[in-house]
């Protein structure tokens, strides 16, 4: 399964966010899922990439190359982009060229998809993901969450977003969504498009259900 991840690229944030992100990244690798993310080497993006890499190594899915890069011991998934439980996954980075030129691209990627701007990045992240998980993040993460949710409301796709509510991070957004719902501003119910996982076990159960 391809799991899209939206998250912060900032380093100066609470330690708990890194701990839970690391746990999730390792779980994805050890269960053969692929991750599709923004491909940055900073903040939670860098954390999930490193955790995925270490999870792959511990699960004996990969060997380490001489330069520390991932060398897979078998062919990648379908067209090099698909992972599923019991198969070898990929760490797929959708990286704007401006990020790459700035030296902020993760060196743990097994698949690199370049793009020209953030709009293209969002389209590609969604296209290559089966389900999306939003970890703590700022303006960019909110932009991605609402872009995917808005597209779902009018029928462009049926992919679910899961807010991983680490340390109650998403509580204020949940309250806003409830308020918008009460005011009649959301087509249907926001929970038709967005789920909330308040624990790691809830998160993995939701992902497993989507598989």
Question: Model-predicted segments: where are they?
Answer:
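A cross-family phosphate/adenosyl-ligand binding-site feature
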Residues: 1-77, 83-128, 164-211
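Glycine-rich anion-binding loop/nest that anchors nucleotide
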Residues: 36, 132-138, 160-165
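Active-site/ligand-binding-proximal alpha/beta "capping" segment
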Residues: 119-153
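Arginine/glycine-rich "motif VI" loop of SF2 helicases in the C-terminal RecA-like domain
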Residues: 151-159, 185-186
């Amino acid at each position: 399964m391809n799991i899209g991840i939206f998250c912060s690229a900032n380093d100066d944030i609470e330690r708990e966010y890194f701990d839970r992100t690391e746990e999730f990244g390792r779980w994805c690798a050890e269960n053969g899922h692929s991750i599709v993310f923004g491909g940055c080497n900073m903040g939670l993006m860098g954390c999930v990439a490193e955790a995925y890499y270490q999870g792959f190594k511990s699960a004996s899915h990969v060997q380490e190359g001489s330069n520390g890069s991932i060398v897979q011991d078998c062919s990648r998934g379908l067209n090099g982009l698909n992972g599923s439980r019991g198969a070898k996954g990929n760490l797929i980075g959708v990286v704007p060229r401006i990020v790459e030129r700035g030296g902020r691209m993760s060196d743990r990627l097994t698949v690199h998809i370049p793009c020209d701007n953030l709009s293209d990045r969002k389209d590609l992240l969604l296209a290559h993901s089966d389900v999306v998980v939003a970890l703590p993040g700022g303006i960019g993460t909110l932009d991605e969450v609402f872009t995917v949710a808005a597209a779902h409301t009018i029928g462009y796709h049926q992919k679910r977003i899961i807010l991983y509510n680490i340390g109650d991070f998403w509580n204020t957004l949940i309250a806003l969504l409830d308020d918008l719902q009460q005011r009649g501003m959301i087509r249907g119910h926001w929970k038709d498009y967005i789920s909330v996982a308040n624990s790691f076990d809830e998160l993995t159960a939701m992902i497993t259900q989507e598989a």
